[in-house]
Amino acid sequence: MAYTAEDVKRLREATAAGMVDCKKALDEAGGDFNKAVEIIRVKGLKGVTKREGRSTSNGLIAAKAEGTTAVMLELNCETDFVAKGDRFQAVADELLGHLFASKQKDLAAFVASKLPSGKGVQEAIDEANATLGEKVELRRIAVIDGSAAALYLHRTSPDLPPQVGVLVALAKADDVVGKDVAQHIAAFAPQYLNRESVPADVIDNERRVAEETARNEGKPDAAIAKIVEGRVTGFIKEVSLLEQAFAKDQKKSVQQILTDAGNSVSAFYRFRVGQ
């Protein structure tokens, strides 16, 4: 069965394979389009294991919020060329829709689940791996369910998909405050919600480092305890969302901004591609 240039084009669009590979597949398939798709898929899947050790430092953040449900995921690939492509972004959209519908918070359980089409999530990722010719992996997911939520996606470059994403769980819906706090989180990257959520071992380590630093600086023994506590307090303010100075008004903390608005934050998630 003969094939045309239009068949090659259609096969490239369907599989994201190169022109030469598409021609070879059509030759091998005797011009049968569906068989050619299967040939490319099989050949691509054979290369999946070879890509397992590769680094996936590129990709995108996808998120969706509606009502009292908000979800976010990070899908990784090897190059920004693939990250910018429609095929890769379509995979992310399909996974995001399934995540929103399932509200599954456990990554392993989500990857083991099935999409509405009946295809497994892992199978969809493996197919993307094969057709795109790069290692593709779902790195992490986040779900807020049962509370008002705000989301913010940030592009670090206009030609790239979102590289930073934030979800914020609020006591009540507030588009203005929610967006402001989400943008603040994107910019200042807090690690914890408040001082109470900073692990004791993290504080102990910071206190130990602060004391060693103060002694190395030659500070008098009588002043060291006060210096250490001051530095630990500064550290907590730096890493805790509610303790941080608010991006739009440095004279107020994020907690004060929320209090003024009659609102509160119970949780947040911040993803940045590759971090």
State where each predicted segment sits:
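N-terminal assembly/interaction segments in proteins that build large macromolecular machines
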Residues: A2-Q275
